[in-house]
């Protein structure tokens, strides 16, 4: 049985409107009577005797009258998935910036389009021939925009070369970045923000892949008589190593920690799935719009700019996010991968130190904005 019978989404407040930064630290500290916990966990005597769903409606009415919301824009929709109907609506058609809840839209679209078994791949290939322990040819590192690619993966590349019996390379080391376009920032991003690097070939989140590759080869005792460049892999290249990370691995960090780089990687995987090369934000938006149309809403009403929510050009509604969550709930393959990746109130991710009261801790899976 699915764990949740009710999704509470979306409470959007105009400020703050920026998506959470990719390196946001979740403070490890005692959270005493935090505002959100006390608001959600304090049930009055009157609300305890009210029938469902009137008790929920009463509580939300009281919350919206609080000082917290006097100078804020709010879009709210509460949906009972068992009854398949909305039990509360407030400005649910109001266009608002989603901030990091945009990541939920990206995640649902990605699982729907790519499937839960999708892999984020990085390959290494070579041309030429090996003779007398020398590779007379070029090596290509083909980026697939895997945000988790790290030193262990790079070591696997180097070990593959050593297993060929190669101790000298006479040729060039090429980065193949043809998977996506050359845009380094998303549309509507603030130039002075701590933005992720939109490169399909990263190592440990940094755009220094080939420099690290060359250094690690030499540190491993391989003589490299080569220069570094950028070039698309030729058709006759022979691939000797592929490293990958799974959809679930990317989703976990993307949603639990609200990681912008992981969300943008997911966004460009969506774009790449269309077959258009290079992958562009425009292609990803087209896929998201088709899904919006599929769930019965008009995609022209919304503005989708990026996958992370960093863009100030994103505008969506509470209704859209709830209807996408409904779609995810009713499609088992999406739900299976999405639900475990959402932060759990009082337990982990961006909700670890929030909603820690007895009614909410461990009982709410949600995405922060």
Where in the sequence are the language-model features?
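Beta-lactamase-like hydrolase cores
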Residues: 24-82, 88-95, 159-165
């Amino acid at each position: 049985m699915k764990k949740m019978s009710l999704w509470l989404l979306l409470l959007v407040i105009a400020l703050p409107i920026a998506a959470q930064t990719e390196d946001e630290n979740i403070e490890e500290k005692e959270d005493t009577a935090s505002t959100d916990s006390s608001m959600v966990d304090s049930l009055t005597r009157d609300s305890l005797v009210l029938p469902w769903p009137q008790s929920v409606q009463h509580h939300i009415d009281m919350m919206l009258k609080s000082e917290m919301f006097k100078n804020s824009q709010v879009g709210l929709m509460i949906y009972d998935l068992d009854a398949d109907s909305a039990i509360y609506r407030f400005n649910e058609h109001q266009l608002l910036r989603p901030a990091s809840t945009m990541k939920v839209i990206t995640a649902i679209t990605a699982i729907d389009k790519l499937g839960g078994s999708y892999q984020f791949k990085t390959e290494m290939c070579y041309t030429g021939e090996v003779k007398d322990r020398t590779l007379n040819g070029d090596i290509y590192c083909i980026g697939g925009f895997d945000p988790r690619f790290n030193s262990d993966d790079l070591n696997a590349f180097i070990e593959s070369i050593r297993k060929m019996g190669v101790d000298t390379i006479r040729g060039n080391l090429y980065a193949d970045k043809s998977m996506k376009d050359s845009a380094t920032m998303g549309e509507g991003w603030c130039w002075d923000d701590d933005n992720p690097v939109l490169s399909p070939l990263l190592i440990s989140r940094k755009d220094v892949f080939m420099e690290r590759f060359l250094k690690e080869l030499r540190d491993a005792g391989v003589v490299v008589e080569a220069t570094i460049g950028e070039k698309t892999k030729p058709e006759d290249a022979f691939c000797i190593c592929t490293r990958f990370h799974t959809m679930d691995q990317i989703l976990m960090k993307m949603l639990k920690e609200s990681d912008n780089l992981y969300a943008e990687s997911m966004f460009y995987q969506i774009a790449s799935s269309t077959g258009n090369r290079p992958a562009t934000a425009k292609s990803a938006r087209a896929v998201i719009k088709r899904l919006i149309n599929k769930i019965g809403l008009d995609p022209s009403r919304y503005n989708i700019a990026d996958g992370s929510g960093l863009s100030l050009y994103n505008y969506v509604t509470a209704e859209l996010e709830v209807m996408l969550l409904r779609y995810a709930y009713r499609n088992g393959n999406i739900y299976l991968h999405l639900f475990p990746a959402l932060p759990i109130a009082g337990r982990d991710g961006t909700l670890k130190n929030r909603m820690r009261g007895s009614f909410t801790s461990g009982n709410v899976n949600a995405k922060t904005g």
